[in-house]
Amino acid sequence: MYKRQVVIDLNWREVFWDHSSFSSKISKDQRVQLIREFLNHSSVLKLAREEATLFFEDVNPLLISQQLSNRPDVIITDGKNPVLWYINGLQGITETPTSQKIVDTTGAGDAFLAGFISKLISSGYPLNEKEIEDCIKFAGVCGLLTCLGEGAIEQQPYYEKVNKFLGSLIS
């Protein structure tokens, strides 16, 4: 039914490379190249803005996709700022809801990606800009709802809660 998809959320943490015996033998540029080689295997690549800048010296998702041999779909998040994306040959910028009531951002990126994958699969892979925007907005609400309480696990949004929130934006 679906072809195999490899989704990578880089979650770069410099601290895991700074003190390993492996990293002491290679330069920072070599580390960047190793990571980029790994990212060549992705079908969908989710990056934070800082990761896009560090590994690709760019935040344009289309240009990042073109730098990788697999030409993945690319999503770039940046906290409360709009999400940049290149998906299924289309490129866009999607505003996602924000709140003044943020308690804890732990798990927001994971919730975003989980929501995106869920919507991606349930929609049969988006073919047009509206469907892609719907997936991104759904994912954004998943990330936001996770931030409204403490911890990543307790605040995991249920499908119904996300749809109710999205419905309140429309009415």
Which residues make up each language-model segment?
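Conserved small/polar residues in nucleotide/adenosyl-binding loops
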Residues: 1-5
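Conserved phosphate-binding/catalytic region of the ribokinase-like
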Residues: 59-171
